[in-house]
Amino acid sequence: MAPKKDEKPATAEAGAEAPAKAEAKPKAEKAGKKAKKEPAKKAAKEPKGDGEKKDKKKKKSAVETYKLYIYKVLKQVHPDTGISSKAMSIMNSFINDIFEKVATEASKLSRYNKKPTVTSREIQTAVRLVLPGELAKHAVSEGTKAVTKFTSG
């Protein structure tokens, strides 16, 4: 409100203080810009609010699934074989269940060892506990290979 008080005396005294008035306007504009920046931020938040509605729609359509990866693996193993949507849904549920079991077991292991971080070692042990026999061995070897590839670049 101080810039408005400065402007009123400047408008009352016309003539010699016209340059001061011109200088007062940029200051007022700067103050106005500061004030405008805040509503601009709010305005920027408002489209995000609208965007959130769009994001909600996107979230509905972009639910995390493994369908694409299941399909890619299927085509690597059997290029001429297809999969029904029901079978794909079952496979996706299966992977989500296994992932949840491994994550839960790894979390328990880190708590037992009083460590705040779940490392690859906890994941490896959890895989050995959750998956049976030969499947666990293959999963551990593939996981080790993937971690090595990731860390090497």
UniProtKB/Swiss-Prot annotation:
InterPro entries: Histone-fold, Histone_H2A/H2B/H3, Histone_H2B, HISTONE_H2B_site. The keyword Transcription does not apply. GO terms for cellular component: nucleosome; nucleus. It is found in: Nucleus; Chromosome. The N-terminus is blocked. Can be acetylated to form H2BK33ac and H2BK34ac. Acetylated mainly on the ubiquitinated form. It comes from the Eukaryota. There is a cross-link at K149 (Glycyl lysine isopeptide (Lys-Gly) (interchain with G-Cter in ubiquitin)). The keyword rRNA processing does not apply. Its main location: nucleus. Residues 1-10, 20-54 have a biased composition (Basic and acidic residues). Gene3D superfamilies: Histone, subunit A (1.10.20.10). CDD domains: HFD_H2B. Keywords: Acetylation, Chromosome, DNA-binding, Isopeptide bond, Nucleosome core, Nucleus, Ubl conjugation. The modification N6-acetyllysine is found at K41, K42. Residues 1-60 are annotated as: Disordered. One of its GO terms (molecular function) is protein heterodimerization activity. Belongs to the histone H2B family. Core component of nucleosome. Nucleosomes wrap and compact DNA into chromatin, limiting DNA accessibility to the cellular machineries which require DNA as a template. Histones thereby play a central role in transcription regulation, DNA repair, DNA replication and chromosomal stability. DNA accessibility is regulated via a complex set of post-translational modifications of histones, also called histone code, and nucleosome remodeling. The nucleosome is a histone octamer containing two molecules each of H2A, H2B, H3 and H4 assembled in one H3-H4 heterotetramer and two H2A-H2B heterodimers. The octamer wraps approximately 147 bp of DNA. This is Histone H2B.3. It comes from Chlamydomonas reinhardtii (Chlamydomonas smithii). The lineage of its organism: Eukaryota, Viridiplantae, Chlorophyta, core chlorophytes, Chlorophyceae.
